[in-house]
C-alpha cells in the first residue's frame, strides 16, 4: 500500500527537501534561473530575489516537528542555499534540536574558509560541492562566475573541521575525458565521494547557445559518450595521465591563496 505523507511523518521517516534562497553567485548557462539570451548570465527577470530567515524557519518548523524528520536536503533549484545569510544558524537549529541529518548542495564558491570551518564542526552535515574541471578554465566553462581554487579551499576547510564532502560533476563534452582527474583532485582536498551525471539540459539538440558575461555568443556541447556509470567510461588508465594525477602543485598554491579570501556575502547577486 502506498504510504502517505502523514504515515512517513509519524514513523520518523520523512525526508524534507528545501529551497531556501533564490540568490546565486554563479551564472550556469543551462540553469533554470539563468537568463542566457540578454548577456551577463544574470537571473531571469521573473524570478524574485528571496531567502528564508532563521526566524521564518523556526516558525515554520518547530522543535517537535524537527524530531519527526529523518533528514533534510537543502538544495537549490533557483538559487544556491549557501547564499542564504542564515544557513549556518538554520543548520545549527536543526542539529541542536534533533537527530536529523542534513545535506547541503552548493557550487561551493561562496563564503570564506573560516565560515566553512565553522560549518564543518556541526555534526551530521554533508555537503555536495560542484566541481567540473581540473583548471579554472575548464571549471568556468559551465559553472560560470565560480572559482575552482576557492571551492577546493572551502571543501578542505570543511572536511578538516570534521564535515563530510561529496562532489557532483555534470558532464559536458569539454570535461568528459577528465573525469578521473577531477575525481583525484577533489579527493586530495577532502572529498570522500565523487558522482558524475551527464547533463540533461540539451532539450533541442547537442548544443545550448547563450550570451556570456561579456556579451559574446557561446555554446555548451553535449557529451558524446554514455556516462550512466563509471564502468561505461572505459579504462581510466587510457584517459588519465597518472604521472600528474596526485600532486597538482600549481593548483595547491592557488588553493592556499583562496583559503585567505574574505567573505564576499555583502555583494550578493541581485
What are these regions (language model features)?
Residues 102, 165, 194:
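Hydrophobic anchor at the start of a short beta-strand
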Residues 86, 90-94, 131, 176-195:
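Short, electropositive alpha-helical surface patch
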Residues 155-178, 199-201:
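Conserved strand-turn element in the central/C-terminal portion of the radical SAM core barrel
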Residues 1-126, 137, 141-149, 153, ...:
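Conserved alpha-helical substructure of the radical SAM core
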Residues 269-270:
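Active-site and channel-lining beta-strand-loop segments
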Residues 104, 129, 167-169:
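Structural beta-sheet core signal
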Residues 107-111, 133, 172-175:
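Short beta->alpha connector loops
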Residues 208-221, 225:
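PAPS-dependent sulfotransferase catalytic core
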Amino acid at each position: 500500500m502506498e504510504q502517505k505523507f502523514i504515515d512517513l511523518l509519524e514513523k520518523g521517516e520523512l525526508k524534507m527537501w528545501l529551497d531556501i534562497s533564490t540568490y546565486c553567485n554563479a551564472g550556469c548557462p543551462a540553469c533554470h534561473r539563468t537568463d542566457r539570451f540578454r548577456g551577463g548570465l544574470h537571473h531571469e527577470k521573473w524570478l524574485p530575489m528571496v531567502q528564508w530567515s532563521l526566524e521564518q524557519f523556526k516558525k515554520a518548523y518547530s522543535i517537535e516537528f524537527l524530531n519527526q524528520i529523518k533528514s533534510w536536503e537543502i538544495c537549490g533549484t533557483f538559487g544556491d542555499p549557501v547564499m542564504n545569510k542564515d544557513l549556518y544558524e538554520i543548520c545549527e537549529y536543526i542539529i541542536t534540536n534533533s537527530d536529523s541529518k542534513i545535506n547541503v548542495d552548493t557550487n561551493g564558491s561562496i563564503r570564506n574558509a573560516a565560515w566553512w570551518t565553522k560549518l564543518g564542526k556541526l555534526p551530521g552535515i554533508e555537503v555536495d560541492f560542484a566541481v567540473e574541471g581540473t583548471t579554472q578554465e575548464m571549471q568556468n566553462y559551465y559553472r560560470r562566475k565560480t572559482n575552482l581554487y576557492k571551492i577546493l579551499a572551502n571543501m578542505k576547510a570543511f572536511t578538516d573541521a570534521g564535515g563530510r564532502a561529496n562532489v557532483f560533476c555534470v558532464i559536458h563534452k569539454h570535461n568528459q575525458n577528465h573525469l578521473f582527474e577531477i575525481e583525484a583532485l577533489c579527493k586530495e582536498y577532502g572529498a570522500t565521494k565523487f558522482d558524475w551525471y551527464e547533463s540533461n539540459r540539451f532539450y533541442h539538440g547537442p548544443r545550448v547557445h547563450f550570451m556570456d558575461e561579456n556579451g559574446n555568443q557561446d555554446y555548451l556541447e553535449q557529451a558524446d559518450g554514455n556516462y550512466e556509470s563509471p564502468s561505461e567510461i572505459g579504462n581510466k588508465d587510457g584517459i588519465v595521465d597518472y604521472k600528474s594525477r596526485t600532486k597538482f602543485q600549481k593548483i595547491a598554491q592557488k588553493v592556499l591563496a583562496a583559503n585567505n579570501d574574505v567573505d564576499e556575502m555583502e555583494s550578493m547577486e541581485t
